């Protein structure tokens, strides 16, 4: 049976930590920022850990992990 492929979109958007958490960037940062509060823009920086159930789904799409 051939090797399973990792979804390209998952490679670009997510990282898996050493403890197995799936990290992703925050959304709502592309346009319309003038209407958003400074606090919202500040808290959307960086990355966040996905909820456990979403992380399981992402791991299914990356059968051999992500670098």
Curated annotation (Swiss-Prot):
Protein's organism: Acidiphilium cryptum (strain JF-5)
Listed PROSITE patterns: RIBOSOMAL_L35
SUPFAM superfamilies named in the record: L35p-like
Name used for this protein in its record: Large ribosomal subunit protein bL35
Classification of source organism: Bacteria, Pseudomonadati, Pseudomonadota, Alphaproteobacteria, Acetobacterales
NCBIfam families: rpmI_bact
GO molecular-function terms, A-Z: structural constituent of ribosome
Family: Belongs to the bacterial ribosomal protein bL35 family.
Name of the coding gene: rpmI
One GO cellular component term: cytosolic large ribosomal subunit
InterPro entries, alphabetized: Ribosomal_bL35, Ribosomal_bL35-like, Ribosomal_bL35_CS, Ribosomal_bL35_sf
A biological-process GO annotation: translation
Keyword annotations of the record: Ribonucleoprotein, Ribosomal protein
Superkingdom to which the source organism belongs: Bacteria
């Amino acid at each position: 049976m051939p090797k399973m492929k990792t979804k390209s979109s998952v490679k670009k958007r997510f990282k898996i930590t050493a403890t197995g958490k799936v990290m992703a960037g925050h959304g709502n940062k592309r346009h319309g920022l003038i209407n958003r509060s400074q606090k919202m823009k500040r808290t959307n920086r960086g990355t966040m850990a996905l909820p456990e159930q979403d992380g399981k789904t992402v791991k299914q799409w990356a059968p051999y992990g992500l670098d």
